[in-house]
Amino acid sequence: MNRDQSDLHIDELLADPFGGNIEIPGSEAVKAEKEQVRLVDVLPEENKEKAIQLAGQIDHKNMQSIVLYGSQAQSKLLNFSHDMINHVQKKDVGEIGEILGELMKKLEQVNPDDLQSKKKGFLARMFGRVSSSLQEVLSKYQKTSVQIDRISLKLEHSKNALISDNKLLEQLYEKNKEYFAALNVYIAAGELKLEELKTKTIPELKQQAESSDHNQMAVQEVNDLIQFADRLDKRVHDLLLSRQITIQSAPQIRLIQNTNQALAEKIQSSIVTAIPLWKNQVAIALTLLRQRNAVDAQQKVSDTTNELLLKNAELLKTNTIETARANERGLVDIDTLKKVQESLISTLEETLTIQEEGRIKRRQAEEELMMMEGDLKQKLITIKER
């Protein structure tokens, strides 16, 4: 958001400093210390000028103007708080946890031991259903691979939703900065007006009242002005409380954004790294298994031919031993495949942990925002009733 746009939003918030028709959906009041230094002295130059102009618009003869002073910005802040709560409530990533849990179940269904060559007896080697068992293993892994691809699409959609949420949160963050700047102008203007009343207007009016004999109206004007200053001081304090909400909202928004970003990165890691690696390793293992079965089948043909032609018990014994040794020879490193799968499952478990932490933090943020919103609403209602 560029500077011109930011100034435009601040101007809109300052356009009606003494209120108007404002809808109040809810608020919260929090305790805050009043600043001991003049806020106007630390404002940017353009906002300092706005504060000075706004201070000049505060009419101490209009008691009712204090009630709605700055309510435009407070109303916008109230709507902003509602947007935050709606975002936290509607954008729950619980579905992501379910998808990741589904992915873990599918991966756990895959047993690397299915790819291991098992020792077979002589008759099994001679007449075993090699092709049938291989097809069963292939069918199982192909089915699981298709299911994992579907889950990957769901994860991709969830990742894009998290990224989209972060863009929306960034817009809310910028709005929060605008409200903070506008409230600073209102507060600074109120402080300037209070300073003028206490150091100039009230003392001058007191002096006039004291110099006028039997002028009770002058005394009443002094009292009215003191009451106005007291109400303005309370109103500035209320605006300070509203500004505190914007200060608290900034880290809360960033916290939600960081959690979303971490979860999106973990999902991305699963999609582009862990799952393809798992599929590649399974494909390699299946290929090696197919090769091993082809070698076994060819060896069986050779053994059978030798047994039928030579009719030699010693040669049969030798060929049987060689066949058994060939069957015991392993071509697939099952331990490596297990470690790859364990690493993938560990990655998913870590992702679930981050997701759960994000859920807890959002719930905490929601509770805090709702508490603040309720108190601010009560405060605005109290102001309306004055």
From Swiss-Prot:
Name any one Pfam family assigned in the record.
Answer: TelA
Highest taxon above the source species: Bacteria
Task: Identify its protein family.
Answer: Belongs to the TelA family.
What protein is this chain from?
Uncharacterized protein YaaN
Q: Which gene encodes it?
A: yaaN
